Every structure is written in structure tokens, then in C-alpha cells.
């Protein structure tokens, strides 16, 4: 088995709650049990809401709980690396610009549900013409970006659940970059990942 590395990656946009605490505890216990390392990674990708005061409280809470970390990192320190990867993915056509407003996306979601269909993104942005894009930008719209999933099965062997499989066609292309250019959790976490165990179900799906 590879050297075990686990991590607790809170977003400093608020105070810790019971869910955060449980996640930190499970990761710390697993690292302790198998002689691995437990890392604290500050996920400060949300530029507007991240605050140092929340970081300080998170550290104090972990120390009070006795959950001592062996190393610490922060996502914002790696933005240059994330920008490099983003540029490559855009060039490869794996990240694409979308101009829908939140209201338009919500309308699409409700319409799909009303028809008994899964509320996955319809990839309308891939059909936008140069004229469409010029029109949106003239309206003052700024694009957000999605990661284009490739067709086929995504599968792996989970130590708890056994073989897990998802069909990419049944999943929405995830939004990875906000309108203001900041990264959502998905992209930096995948680029930065070097952890061997314990992932949240919603992260994997």
C-alpha cells in the first residue's frame, strides 16, 4: 500500500460545523491508524468570501480537538500552476466558455425535471456562434467555464463500496471557473491532489 496521506480542506468562508469536524476526525484517525500524514489545506479559492479570521478559527478548533496536522498548504499559493493547466485544457477543448445566467440555468433545470429528465447541462454553449458570443459580451455578460466530460464509463475500485461506475453521459459538465475568473473547488483539488484515501461521495460523483 502506498504511503497514506489524508487531508482536511476547509474553505475559510465561515466557521466550522459538525460536518467539517467529522471529516477532519475521519481523516486524522485514518492517518494515525496507518502511520500516514494528515494535512491541512486551506481552500481559499473564493476570493470574495475567504477571510483570515475564519482560517484562524479553523486552526484553533483543530488544535482544541487534538487533531494536529503534519503539513499545511493553501490553494491560492498555487494559482499560477492552476492557470497553466487551465490554459492547456482550453487549448485541448476540454474547458469551454458558457454565458448562461443563473436564472437561465435554473429555468433549464426546472424544465428538464418537469419532463422527467435528469437536470444535466445541455451543452448549449458548445453550439454558440461567434455572433452569439459577441451579443452576450455586448450585454456585459462574462463567461463561466465548464469541464467537458468525455463519453464512456468512469470507474474505480472503492475500498468500502467495491467497484463504482458512473456513465459520463448522465453527468453535467462541472463548472470549474466562475465569472470573476476564480476557481471552483473541483479543478484546483484535482490538480493539487496527492492523497491516497478518503474522498467525499459528492466529490467523486
Residue ranges of model-derived segments:
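Active-site cores that bind ATP or allylic diphosphates and position pyrophosphate for catalysis
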Residues: 96-199
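A short, hydrophobic C-terminal helix/tail in secreted or cell-surface proteins
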Residues: 200-205
Amino acid at each position: 500500500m502506498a504511503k497514506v496521506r489524508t487531508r482536511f480542506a476547509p474553505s475559510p468562508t465561515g466557521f466550522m460545523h459538525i460536518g467539517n469536524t467529522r471529516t477532519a476526525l475521519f481523516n486524522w484517525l485514518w492517518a494515525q491508524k496507518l502511520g500516514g500524514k494528515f494535512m491541512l489545506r486551506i481552500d481559499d479559492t473564493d476570493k470574495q468570501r475567504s477571510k483570515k479570521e475564519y482560517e484562524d478559527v479553523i486552526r484553533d478548533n483543530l488544535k482544541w480537538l487534538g487533531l494536529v496536522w503534519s503539513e499545511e498548504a493553501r490553494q491560492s499559493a498555487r494559482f499560477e500552476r492552476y492557470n497553466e493547466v487551465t490554459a492547456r485544457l482550453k487549448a485541448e477543448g476540454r474547458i469551454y466558455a458558457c454565458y448562461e445566467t443563473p436564472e437561465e440555468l435554473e429555468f433549464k433545470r426546472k424544465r428538464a425535471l418537469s419532463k422527467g429528465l435528469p437536470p444535466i447541462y445541455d451543452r448549449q454553449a458548445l453550439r454558440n456562434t461567434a455572433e452569439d458570443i459577441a451579443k452576450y459580451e455586448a450585454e456585459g455578460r462574462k463567461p463561466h467555464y465548464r469541464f467537458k466530460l468525455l463519453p464512456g464509463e468512469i470507474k474505480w475500485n472503492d475500498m468500502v463500496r467495491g467497484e463504482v461506475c458512473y456513465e459520463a453521459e448522465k453527468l453535467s459538465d462541472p463548472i470549474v471557473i466562475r465569472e470573476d475568473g476564480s476557481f471552483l473547488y473541483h479543478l484546483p483539488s484535482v490538480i493539487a491532489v496527492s492523497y491516497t484515501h478518503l474522498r467525499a461521495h459528492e466529490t467523486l460523483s
